[in-house]
Amino acid sequence: SLRLGAQGPVLSVSSACASANHALGLAMQQIRAGAADIMLAGGSEAMLCLGGVKAWEGLRVLAPDACRPFSLGRRGMVIGDGAGVLVLEAEDHARARGAVVLGRLAGFGMCADAGDILAPDPGGAARAMRLALADAGLSAVDVGYVNAHGTGTLANDRSEARAIRDVFGPNPPPVSSTKAMHGHAIGATGALEAIACL
């Protein structure tokens, strides 16, 4: 804020793997509400330290080699460090200043699954996707690609696949996860995946 001279709403979001997604969604809501014309939103994480690695090792979810989301050969997740920030801007404001628009955040939904950190309830993910579709004014048939959380753990991938089938039916759009490229960067993941999808 000091370096950029930025003013307006400022907040920190701490909701584990969903932190950056929540930051992006909340920034979009602030713009829609007229609280700001431009918001910087994203996430960062530095998990590659002894304590961070040991915590995940204790959960027995780390792959010995690589992250392979939704693959029959998946063996777990890989921890990643990273950071990503996106500039979100009201469409009319962006056009007025001649900005190059790379994408559009159309809708947002969040929902706790009230399950287990290692075995999430697919109902929570399905509700979040439905809320995002409703917020965007879209239906499932309007979606051409799903960027999944896709940790590469058997429990998460199965749960997420069930949630996607629940929302999109037996013939969902193409689904993948970028975690095979950057690992699971926990609080930064949503921002890294949003950038990759652009």
What are these regions (language model features)?
Residues 62, 66-138, 144-145:
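Condensing-enzyme catalytic core mediating Claisen C-C bond formation in acyl metabolism
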Residues 24, 49-55, 115-118, 157-159:
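Short acidic, glycine/serine/threonine-rich loops at helix termini
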